[in-house]
Amino acid sequence: MGHLHIVHWRLTMNGAIAALFLCLVMVHQQHAVRILAVFPTPAYSHHSVFKVYIEALAERGHDVVVIKSTDRINYANRNGLRGNVSEIDASLSQEYYGRLMRHAGVFRKRGIVADSSTVTAHNYMGLVRMMSDQFDLPIVKSFIEEAHKHKFDLLITEAYIDYPLVFSHLFGDLPVVQISSGYAVAENFETMGAVSRHPVYYPNLWRDKFSGLNVWKQSMKCTLSWRYRMNLVNWPDEQNALLKRQFGESTPTIQELRNRVELLFVNTHAIFDNNRPVPPSVQYLGALHLHDKRPDSMYGMVREFLDNATTGAIYVSFGSAISSEDMEPEFIEMLLRVFEKLPYSILWKYDGYMNRMPANVFVQSWFEQYNLLHHKNVRAFVTQGGVQSTDEAVEAIVPMVGMPMMGDQAYNMNKIVELGLGKVVDTVRVNAEQLIEAIVDVAESPKYRKRLRELRHMIHHQPMTPLQKAVWYTEHVIESRRRVVPTMLKTRAANVNYSDYIMSYVFVPFIMFTVMNHLRQLLKMNMV
């Protein structure tokens, strides 16, 4: 009899455990969703940010399909995730991207430096056509043609170009989360109804000068910003024409697709964007790729070189997008003269051939930058000013000398100078003496490290980490979609056109009435 009671108890417990497990599975299935992520820019630094975000969503149990454009990042190589990450490899566009950058007139001065004149609708449309060609690759095209076989609940796209928003239409009216790997552009903020443009407080990202400007130079920069805006005014129409040619006449316009964007993630700390006033639908993250990252021990020749750098070491890298073969010989010779005269050991990320190399210089085509910056003997970082590089320098408390070369790097390094974290030089005009002076000042003065410590403490002193914030807000959009309710994050000004935003329907009639009234008065006077 007792044996029967034990058997009955075991059966009851097994049933309860099975029921509990079934409930957990049902709850998990109820909240886990399928996500489509489209990242069409084949830049390593961009994908290193997106990978952390995608893995975190998979860790929460969501299934993610990633259309990726580089073979240097593998989104599906981590075991133990609760969800699943699968890839559609469109990395053939990487060669296209390199060719586009070479032929777009971007790298002009000293072989590697772009100026604001290269930010044109023509060059932007080159990037859009690259994406269009990417979406025509057989593997991507087949995936699109079988859209009826796939059910997705959310689309994640890279911010700054809106062409990939078309996937929200192709796969069934999906809500969209846009994420930038660094700063967002003015058009992204306009989509969200945030403050987007101001020549002083929220200037154009593509400018190369920001401080020490007299009234005349400031006026010229304002004019440049206006020309940039006017140059791109017809850009959405060109994208619309391409969309309809590629995906059919029923394809919504870019302006219509922007209405589906529920959330914008900006992967910089808000202070670097002048603490821009934004609605809740815009969330600043910052250093997403450094989540839970700790420096690993280094071994081999790099470790030995750094350990022996008793007078200090300087790390020199111009990022993953710059090839040494593009540098003009004059620029390389200038750098070599600087290295020879510096009283430090130099580690230089350089992938070209060199006839001579100073004895104090150690060259490799690739360094584990994050680990290297944490070595106790590293005194300064000579950098192009990319967002991920400056994030790593802040985390390692290494002051910077900026030599901006393209994109948002001049803007980013201007903020580094404003915050007292380093110095910046004019990459086009700098000579050896000026660069030596900047490096020695940054390496020797304690004020830069003091400000770096203060800033690092401030950006760490947050209620949640950047990755936790990204996941929480993403799941808020998902939950709103599931419950068929608005996210309540967006402002009424989201994606409003300029004429409505400035209330032209109010002041234009008023101006016309005033002008007509003055004309009437003049006519009366003439008649008298």
UniProtKB/Swiss-Prot annotation:
Transmembrane segments: none annotated. Residues 1-32 form the signal peptide. The keyword Transferase applies. GO terms for molecular function: UDP-glycosyltransferase activity. Belongs to the UDP-glycosyltransferase family. Catalyzes the transfer of glucose from UDP-glucose to ecdysteroids which are insect molting hormones. Expression of egt interferes with normal insect development and block molting. This is Ecdysteroid UDP-glucosyltransferase. It comes from Mamestra brassicae nuclear polyhedrosis virus.
